[in-house]
């Protein structure tokens, strides 16, 4: 029995200007969620402008040709709605929430922000200040610093995934209004944008509203292409220690290059990641390093497939006295899953976990609206959810062992150790 069949019905249309519209009708939901994405993430920042995508996203509500910043804020609040913008590695996102009664005004506000930003100089400086504060906070977090350093070691300078998406003090200080306006013009047109709607609304209603609001929104450039991520192998294993003596905990990050979301090995890596870091709360890593040995406050892992590349990351927070033992145990688990097939019970539980997690996720209009973007961006097909259970169940124990042997190579992993320890 396919437990996911029929759980996400998607209507799709593409307007003449290239804007893609996705609709998940939920007749019983008074809440409507609108999620937007554009090919305008950090991979487009360039070597000299890390942080530009997040800077641009931070400016999208800061004033338009029709409204000043506080007018946008006041009107959004008066509707009981919410609109926000942010950016990640590949994409710039908008997230909007409203009720059916406030839909028309909320959508008009959203389109005004997307189509008509003016990037006032005074607001540029406010957003710059916020970003610099975020950077200072990031650089005082042992986990955030460890993740940044591991990523910078794993992906060489010039690689689209080398730099922190939030930028650095010197690059954020150097970004100008012209940089922001130029980035928006180049990356954020309708030809680059997807809008998904989830709630009590039909495809026909969305088509009527979006055609009217975007009638003057013309495609300005060809659809952007995400820069390719060159995988340089063999990668030399690298370890870097950063002392932060005012902290009480050491954070360890071990990172390996993985694959793009569209790669055939994606599903096997995702299943292996569940076994290593999810089952039983924190997977094999947590069970061994935290529960059995008592070496860590937490130990887990994550898998991050992107449009043209990806990475796998193991994390642990430990007492300074346990750094070497914990790191050895992390690498032991990586080697073990690469040498020997997982148990039949783990294999079954990993598939059940993934199917159940998706079923739970799709109960939320917000999660469903975001999930539709992945389906569109990666070309998975509108029936992807119906096929997902069969896809996950087709991953074998040997598939998982093979991909772990290929990608979770301890001899190529980049390790960052940050906290009260000596370099």
Summary of predicted features, one role per range:
Residues 110, 195, 206-213, 330-331:
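PAPS/PAP-binding and catalytic site of the sulfotransferase fold
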Residues 1-47, 65-104, 125, 137-192, ...:
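Non-catalytic beta-strand/loop surface segments
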Residues 50-64:
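Active-site SXXK
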Residues 348-381:
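C-terminal hydrophobic structural anchor segments
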Residues 112-121, 212-221, 332-341:
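A common structural junction motif
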Residues 56, 106, 110, 114, ...:
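Short alpha-helical scaffolding segments that buttress acidic/His motifs in well-ordered protein cores
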Residues 200:
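Carbohydrate-associated surface elements
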